């Protein structure tokens, strides 16, 4: 390990050791302020150059530039999800082993936050002054409701600030992102599906389990969930961003896939049928999805519930939208005498132009730091803080400059989250490019 990589690994390890777990409606932000104190100690030069503002644990920093031109905003959140299960190394130990750094947040997204501020700090140490203002933003509750980012977005709107470009977490650099694509791709999110939580409630008079009768609340919910799995209530379509993604990945495919994906409109019916079985991620880009995540019924082994419910996490597509997607599933639920309750309304972010100058700046940064890597737009199926920034910029993109494996991708929100040590320095170099060229 070279000296630069060693220093970087030790720094990120310290950040991983701060257990900034995000919890719903958590008023105590002490752990986040302790984390920010560590950031100040680690990156003194950039903190000295910036105006720092606290937003109840989330923060916004402004680095004054030379001109009055539109600024850019770089983002990565501080909070992480919980880390249950049997990990190879303790999830908040920041263990460096096997040429990797292990721990919750290495990829999502303390790694990105560290690389962003490390790049800025190194530039600040040379007395570099950016051409335009650069803002840095970090939310403390991205993993729950994103209210920190929403609050900052609202304040930026009040101030009349519009960003030339916003760059947040998102796609990464992966080999063969879709089966058959033999190249290495940087997947840049140009939009994200909306998210809404729904509660499906089935009721009855209850009773004793010895005489259950038919169509109890749990049975009806089971039939309903099975019907959702089998139904086609959510419309599949290939949006322009996905068309462009298919064309990009087809470049490294062999025939006949190369020709089929290279002409997605011509082969649209075939692709709509085949893609979900080839790639679950690509399949989720084609339509609204509904995943059942929580459930509750009776508290007794021999008691029929008077009320049972399941929670469904819906990610609605741009072409079907929230209102139409909810209406479709509500209509299906009614067939099983199930009430649909919208717990938290959401919104889909607009799709940013992948032919724009800001996108090309990202693409140029990728090709400069990662030679041979192909840049492709895609639609994020998950949610990020970036969705709130579509209110202050027409060019919101989602990309984390780390080269990872499929196994590492699966470790995000799962067991043994880790990052290769060799991925650290290029990430810093990419952020330097963005700060000097955007």
Task: Label the model's feature ranges.
Residues 215, 325-333:
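Short amphipathic alpha-helices in soluble, non-transmembrane regions
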Residues 78-79, 228-233, 330-338:
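A common structural junction motif
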Residues 101, 107-187:
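Acidic/histidine-rich catalytic neighborhood of metal-dependent amide-processing enzymes
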Residues 69, 89, 131, 162, ...:
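Short, solvent-exposed loop/turn segments at the edges of secondary structure
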Residues 1-106, 123-132:
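Acidic/His- and Gly-rich active-site-bordering loop/insert found
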Residues 151, 155, 210-233:
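A short core secondary-structure module
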Residues 52-56, 62, 67, 174-175, ...:
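An extended, acidic, His-containing surface patch that forms the Zn2+-binding/catalytic region
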Residues 170-171, 182-197, 399-409:
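Flexible glycine/proline-rich, aromatic-decorated loop/lid segments
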């Amino acid at each position: 390990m070279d000296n630069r990589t060693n220093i970087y690994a030790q720094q990120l390890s310290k950040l991983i050791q701060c257990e900034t777990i995000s919890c719903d409606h958590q008023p105590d932000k002490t752990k986040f302020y302790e984390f920010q104190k560590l950031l100040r100690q680690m990156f003194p030069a950039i903190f000295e150059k910036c105006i720092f503002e606290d937003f109840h644990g989330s923060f916004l920093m402004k680095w004054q530039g030379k001109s009055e031109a539109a600024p850019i905003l770089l983002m990565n959140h501080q909070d992480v999800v919980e880390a249950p299960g049997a990990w190879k190394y303790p999830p908040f130990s920041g263990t460096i082993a096997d040429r990797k750094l292990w721990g919750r947040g290495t990829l999502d997204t303390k790694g990105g936050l560290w690389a962003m501020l490390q790049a800025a700090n190194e530039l600040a140490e040379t007395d570099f002054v950016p051409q335009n203002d650069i803002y840095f933003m970090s939310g403390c509750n991205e993993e729950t409701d994103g209210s920190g980012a929403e609050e900052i977005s609202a304040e930026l709107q009040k101030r009349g600030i519009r960003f030339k470009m916003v760059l947040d977490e998102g796609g990464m650099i992966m080999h063969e992102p879709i089966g058959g694509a033999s190249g290495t791709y940087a997947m840049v999110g140009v939009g994200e599906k909306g998210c809404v939580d729904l509660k499906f409630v089935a009721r009855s008079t209850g009773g004793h389990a010895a005489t259950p009768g038919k169509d109890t609340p749990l049975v009806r919910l089971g039939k309903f969930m099975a019907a959702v799995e089998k139904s086609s209530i959510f419309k599949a379509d290939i949006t322009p961003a996905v068309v462009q993604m298919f064309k990009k990945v087809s470049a490294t495919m062999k025939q006949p896939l190369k020709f089929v994906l290279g002409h997605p409109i011509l082969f649209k019916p075939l692709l709509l049928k085949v893609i979900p079985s080839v790639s679950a991620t690509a399949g989720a880009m084609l339509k609204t999805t509904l995943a059942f995540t929580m459930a509750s019924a009776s508290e007794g082994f021999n008691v029929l519930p008077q009320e049972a419910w399941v929670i469904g996490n819906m990610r609605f597509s741009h072409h079907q939208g929230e209102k139409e997607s909810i209406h479709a599933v509500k209509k299906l639920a009614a067939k099983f005498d199930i009430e649909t309750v919208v717990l938290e309304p959401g919104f889909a972010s607009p799709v940013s132009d992948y032919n724009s100058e800001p996108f090309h700046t990202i693409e140029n940064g990728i090709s400069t730091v990662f030679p041979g890597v192909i840049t492709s737009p895609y639609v994020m199926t998950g949610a990020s803080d970036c969705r709130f920034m579509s209110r202050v910029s027409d060019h919101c993109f989602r990309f984390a400059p780390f080269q990872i494996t499929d196994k590492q991708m699966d470790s995000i929100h799962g067991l043994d989250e880790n990052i290769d040590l060799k991925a650290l320095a290029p990430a810093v170099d990419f952020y330097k490019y963005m700060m000097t060229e955007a």
